[in-house]
Amino acid sequence: VLGSRGSVIPLFRKQIEAGGPVTVTDPEMTRYFMTIPEASQLVLQAGAMGNGGEVFLLDMGEPVKIVDLAKNMIRLSGFEPDKDIRIEFTGLRPGEKLYEELLTAEEGTNTTTHKKIFEAALEDVNQEWLSREIDRFESCKSDLDVINVLQDIVPTYHPNHNV
């Protein structure tokens, strides 16, 4: 959300004011951006639509390359990227992703009465299976046991190696 705590824009602004460099994680990194008023309005509208138990997804628009955002902010500040102010690539930190993964219609979302709010098509959870998996977690004796159970349940899970 633009202007929120943790947003990259205030960081880039400070780095530009200091003469650089502007730090970008990776040249291919993308993120979605939305203004605080737009995000607030959509969250409130989704809340008003809900009856309980639904999962709503917001249309975040198109992803923006962070390096393009950095270059545009440098230009808008009256400088030339990589000439007046350098862009430095810092590399991914543990757990950080190049892009945000959002559900799409093909992956199970349904339209709602609002064109920017979608509802996730959730499958019923097998209560027997869930109970068994909770028991497995409760019997874990170490962090490594927890990681192993998680990897069994979620094959795409890759732990942070600092754990």
Spans of model-derived segments:
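Strand-loop microenvironment adjacent to phosphate/nucleotide-handling motifs in alpha/beta enzyme folds
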Residues: 1-163
